[in-house]
């Protein structure tokens, strides 16, 4: 009975994937005919340099160049590139527009979330005092300690480079007890109830709090939510879900702190954050990205993303022993995500093996697996994050960065890789 039931389930899965398999066969036939006629793959600006493009199922990782900009963003940057403008005036004007959109006191465009972290830290230490701005990263005579809620991260160098000293705290009680006359800021990437408690502590102790929610959009309402919660400063990456310029970010919050962050940043000569330059194109592009999100039908977009990973799911489920599930993370990168699992030990085929084979494909396919190629090895060895790391038991494919049509290529290739591994183990 078990064998019959298993065969029946396999047949049903194969039947569900039949239309997709037919599309793949037709596409392969066309590709072979094109090659026979001497029509090769289309060249692009990267291939002409000898750089291979990637089918990105991993998500908005910086080392894979983040996300793809909204068409509106590309057009806005093109228009912005045709004029000269005073950058301080532009940032303040954009700040007023960001305030209208979000309810925050003001905002500036930064060089990513890391740039926002640095600018916010400098603002809390030096304020708008030019003598202190020029003095950084020497913090003599300034409040210079930053309480790190939850401990260290791979990104805290953005805070340390301003001259700030990190003070690690892993609970609300530790945060409160860590605050003293030298405390300049509290940093957190916590959400929900934890964030509410931390906001309350910051208000009670009169210490500014910076929330780093780099991957917090979508939903775009988060840009308003943190203002409603009274978070002093909060930041988003421009090159992740926001779909703005990859080298941009948004720092929003109290008007006085945002002005101080601006004065500690480019274009001001002598400011510690001067190297973290953003151009007029990035400033306009990042603002346009946020405006575009407020006009976007998120339900429709999520439906499109779900369709893409559902096609991949139907194809890979035709391989015996493969199981799948779909979920949306609740702590950032909130996109429909496909989990694919198999018995690694029985197959003699690990998550790393699968990710490696997909990365060696033509075209290259990147998935979430066991590795992080962009991490400085010393960070891993130092284990700055207190969370226990477990060996992964699945790969993940993130829908948001899969371009329309690529799901068929991914589904076909992943199916072939898993089928070959299953047959070898059988």
Language-model regions, residue ranges each:
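N-terminal export signals
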Residues: 1-5, 10-33
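General small-molecule cofactor/ligand-binding pocket signal
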Residues: 108, 165-169, 325
